[in-house]
Every structure is written in C-alpha cells, then in structure tokens.
C-alpha cells in the first residue's frame, strides 16, 4: 500500500537524498539484561509489534522525486543473535558487547528498504545479554520509542506467562495521520498559521554566529559529538522555585538559561532557537508509533540587557504564543519564508533546546534486571542542540545537560566550556534571578584566576576597557562569553599590536578566546617586543599582585562609569 508521507518524513527523506548513508537520524536504545531471558519469547514479542504497528513495516520510496510511504502487508524484524568470543573475562565481554552496540547504532538505513528498524541480542554469558534496538527517526520519535519498548515488555510478559497481551486498540495508523495532516494544512487554517509565523519571524536573523574552533565549511557534514554535565540538586530546586514565581515551567527556565548563554557568545541580541514539540493533538494518536514531532522557531530577544527574570517572562510569552500555533509543519514554514538556501548551514535554525528528550524508557521483563546503556551515533543535526532532563542521583533530582554539537565547527573542549558556562549562569540566576544578564558570572569563583604576569595584566586591562561588562574578569574568561564580538576582537588585536608590536590575525582571538591563551600566543610571537610598550611594561613589572588587582578594578570601574553616563 502506498500513502503520502508526513511533512516531517518528507524532510528526512530529502536530507537522506542530500547526504545518503548517514546515521544522523538513527534512534538507538540498548539494555543490559541480567537473568534467565527467553529469547524466543522476545522474538515473538517483536513479531507482535511489527504486526500491530504498520509503520514498522513501512519504507519511504521516491517516485518521480516525490516520497511516499510504502506499507508491507506483513513483515518481520529478526533479532540478530551475536555470540561473543570465548575466553574473554567479564570486563572484556562488556567492552566488546558495547562496542558492537555502538557499531549497530551507527549503521545507516536505506529508507527505501523496510524494515527501518534493527535489533540484536549480544550474548555475554548464559544469563547476561545486551539487547540493542535501533529505529530510524522517519518512523519513530522519542515518545514512540517509549511506546514500542513498553509494549514489547508487555507482550514478552504475556508470552512467558502464557496469556494474551492486553494492549489498547489502534483505531488508526500512522499513514492515516499523514493523510489527515496534509488535509488539515490547507486553505484558511494554513493561511492563519502562516500569517502568525510570517509576522513573528519578519526580519529575524538567518544565521546564528558563534565563535568556533574552525571556519564554517562550504558544505556541512553530520560529524558530531556529545558533551554532558549536571546542574546539582540544590540549584535545580532553586530554579524550580524561580519557575513557580514566574508562573512557568522548568522547560522555560532552562530555555532561558540556554538563550542567555548563547547571547554571551553570539554578537546578536536577536536569535532564533528551535525546540521540538509533539503533534499528537488527538487521543487516537496516543498509542501510535510514528514521527509526530514538529520544530518551532522561537525568536529570542536579549535587547536592553534584561534581568534574568525579565528574559524569563519574554521566553514564557514567546513560547506560549508559539505553542498556540504549533500545527504549522516546520517544513511548510521554511518553504514559505524561503531563506537563502545553502549547504553550509541548516535553514532558519542552527541551535535547538529540548527538555526531557533524553529520558530513557526501560524494558520491564519478569525475572530480568535491566540497565539502560546510552549509545551515541557521533552525529549532529544542527550546530548545537542542548537537551535537559531530570535525572535521579543519590536520592535527589539533578538536571542533566547534554549537548550534541557539530564537529565541523567545535571541539569537545568548546562544548564542555559552553555547558560549564550555562551551568554557572543558571546557578547565579537561581540565587539572584533579578540580576541583569551581563552581570551573571559564567565562571565560578574557584575558576576565576587573576592575571599572573605583566602580559596577562596588560591584556586584561585592554579587555576590560573594550568589553561592555560589569562582571569581574579573569584570565580564563571567554571574550565572547563576556559579550565580545567580531568588532571587539578587531579592536583588541589592534591594541595588542600597539602594546607589543605583534600583528595577530583577528581569527586568533576566536581560536584563543581567553587572556591566558592569548598571553601565551603574544609572548611566543617572533615580533614580540617588550620595548614597544616598555614604559607600560616597566610600570607593570614594578607592581605587586595587589597593585595589579587594583589597576584592573580601576579600569573596570572606569568602564562602568562610561556605561552609566
């Protein structure tokens, strides 16, 4: 049977045509299973899932350049049994099994060949298995993965107990949703939705400019990485209180923190941030497996250096308005706005924030102890996507922050710094939510180091004079995180040249964006000359550590007086 694709499926098919053979949109899950597993019952449960959900028998095939869903009447997803070599100890077995799981997660799918799902059972011992499940995003999303795993567990339990499984009836299939979605997005409803988004995004920037480790290539790839950190339980609790006080959700609070951190990196007060929302608007869709997510383009304004609470209110209102108009498929929006199309970056949105996206569903099998194993495909859909989700740790709830980042642009250290800055900013915002964004520190007091030598002191003095910030400056502070931008970097390089006779490329500031890093570059430069600014250096050499600290604070105070005047 041939059916129309949904708008989201259409976009994924197009991306697959553009860069075939990529695992970017693979959704992997894996579970360590300890106990007497009935592998045959697990296979029967998987067969029942394929029979129940037509989308698991679906491929996406192009006919004359137009993709369609092709649904097979029957199908099977065999669980591949992988026996590990003999003679390995438990640690080696674990490493080997998890290595195979990663390989399975990264194997691409051919969208024209159903099923777009693969499973494997890696045998690491008589009662020890690693179950791997990989589904392509074109037929599944995060909530659908939970449905699949929950129902797989329910049928397995029924099979091992010798009773029929009790599952909610399906009154429609995903193909019906795709037909309904296309019928809905026509005429007056389409005009109403487009009218809102046209007005909301009028004049919005098409590109988020972030200081990167490398120039943006002419054609982006899906190479990516994953970085993770945690917001501690105390800060999470304080942020929950901030959310209650602002009559908003934790999603809004963390989205505000993400937007605030971006604003300290990007030289623009107007930013588009994407977020994923569910298009399950009717109860009949609740038990279905399929791709029901849509992307909203949220326009964030950091103009006039708002306090965190003020920005929180802006984000809350922006999000509420967007959710009231969430039915317009992102693909329709892009087609209507027709931004400049380029292979260098994704259209409209290069940064995204999602809340709760990494919560792992759990296999619940009788007599089996289950432990989830998170797998990464080492890919990135955008320049950066930050996920936040509640995470239990030592009987307390913390918040896990994970960043999927483009390896075309950023190194792992860049991603770690960004998450660290975001975490510190949130900690200070939780303690003093009325603080203006520019005054929220992004380094902890322990991380902030005062200049340790005359070169660092000189660069810090220049820095303080150029940057529009009232926050203290340390040698590990990031120029761009403090509000610097391309023009600031250009002026900084010129001032450094005046002081030391070195001609640094402006790009060096992007590559080495801290005082400590730049001081090392300046001192190692072949044209470095202490005589160029000898009087200044002699003066600095004579200063004690306390005097250097006072000099920097005086420069900072002078800068603040100019701002307030």
Enumerate the predicted regions with their spans:
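A short N-terminal helical cap/helix-turn-helix that marks the beginning
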Residues: 59-60, 152-172, 200-209, 322, ...
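Acyl/amide activation-and-transfer machinery of modular secondary-metabolite enzymes
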Residues: 8-34, 63-88, 103-104, 113-118, ...
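Acyl activation and transfer enzymes in specialized metabolism, enriched
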Residues: 34-57, 133-150, 225-267, 282, ...
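His-Asp-centered acyl/peptidyl-transfer active-site segments
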Residues: 20-26, 54-55, 127-128, 182-194, ...
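C-terminal lobe/hinge of AMP-binding adenylation domains
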Residues: 27, 45, 55, 134-136, ...
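Acyl-group handoff/entry surfaces in thioester-processing enzymes
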Residues: 2-75, 88-184, 192-193, 199-211, ...
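Phosphopantetheine-dependent thiolation modules in NRPS/PKS and related acyl-activating systems
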Residues: 66-70, 74, 173, 427-436, ...
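Flexible, P/S/T/G-rich "lid" or insertion loops adjacent to the active sites of thioester-utilizing
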Residues: 15-24, 168, 190-248, 338, ...
């Amino acid at each position: 049977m041939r059916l129309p694709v949904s708008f989201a499926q259409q976009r994924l098919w197009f991306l697959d045509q553009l860069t075939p053979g990529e695992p970017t949109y693979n959704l992997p899950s894996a579970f360590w299973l300890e106990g007497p597993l009935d592998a045959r019952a697990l296979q029967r449960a998987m067969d029942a899932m394929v029979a129940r959900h037509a989308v698991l028998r679906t491929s996406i095939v192009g006919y004359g350049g137009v993709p369609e869903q092709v649904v097979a009447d029957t199908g099977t997803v065999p669980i591949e049994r992988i026996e590990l070599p003999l003679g390995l100890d438990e640690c080696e077995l674990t490493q080997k099994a998890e290595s195979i799981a990663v390989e399975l997660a990264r194997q691409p799918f051919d969208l024209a060949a159903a099923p777009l799902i693969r499973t494997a059972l890696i045998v690491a011992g008589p009662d020890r298995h690693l179950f791997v499940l990989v589904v392509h995003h074109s037929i599944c999303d995060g909530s659908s993965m939970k449905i699949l795993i929950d129902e797989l567990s329910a049928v397995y339990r029924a099979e091992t107990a010798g009773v029929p499984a009790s599952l909610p009836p399906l009154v429609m299939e995903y193909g019906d949703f795709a037909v309904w979605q296309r019928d809905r997005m026509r005429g007056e409803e389409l005009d109403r939705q487009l009218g809102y988004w046209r007005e909301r995004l009028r004049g919005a920037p098409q590109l988020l400019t972030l200081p990167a480790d490398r120039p943006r290539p002419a054609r982006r790839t899906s190479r990516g990485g994953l970085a993770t950190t945690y917001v501690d339980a105390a800060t999470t609790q304080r942020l929950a209180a901030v959310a209650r006080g602002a009559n908003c959700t934790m999603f809004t609070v963390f989205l505000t923190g993400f937007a605030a951190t971006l604003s300290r990196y990007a030289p623009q007060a107007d930013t588009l941030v994407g977020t994923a929302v569910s298009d399950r608007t009717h109860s009949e869709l609740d038990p279905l497996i399929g791709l029901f997510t849509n992307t909203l383009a949220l326009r964030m304004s950091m103009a006039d250096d708002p306090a965190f609470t003020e920005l929180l209110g802006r984000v809350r209102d922006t999000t509420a308005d967007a959710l009231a108009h969430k039915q317009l498929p992102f693909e329709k929006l892009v087609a209507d706005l027709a931004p400049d199309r380029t292979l260098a970056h994704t259209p409209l949105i290069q940064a995204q924030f999602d809340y709760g996206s990494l919560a792992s569903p759990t296999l619940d099998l009788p007599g089996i102890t289950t432990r989830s194993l998170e797998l990464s495909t080492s890919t990135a859909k955008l320049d950066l996507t930050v996920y936040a989700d509640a995470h239990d740790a030592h009987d307390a709830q913390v918040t896990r922050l994970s960043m999927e980042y483009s390896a075309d642009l950023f190194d792992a250290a860049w991603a770690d710094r960004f998450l660290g800055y975001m975490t510190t900013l949130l900690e200070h915002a939780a303690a003093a939510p009325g603080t203006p964004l520019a005054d929220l520190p992004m380094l902890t007091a322990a991380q902030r180091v005062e200049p340790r030598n005359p070169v660092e002191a000189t660069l810090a003095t220049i820095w303080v004079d150029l940057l529009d910030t009232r926050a203290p400056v340390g040698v590990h502070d990031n120029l761009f995180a403090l509000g610097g931008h391309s023009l600031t970097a250009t002026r900084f390089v010129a001032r450094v040249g005046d002081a030391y006779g070195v001609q640094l490329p402006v790009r060096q500031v992007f590559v080495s964006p801290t005082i400590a890093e730049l001081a090392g570059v300046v001192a190692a430069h072949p044209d470095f000359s202490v005589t160029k600014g000898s009087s200044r250096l002699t003066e600095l050499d004579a200063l004690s550590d306390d005097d250097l600290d006072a000099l920097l604070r005086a420069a900072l105070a002078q800068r603040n007086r100019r701002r307030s005047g």
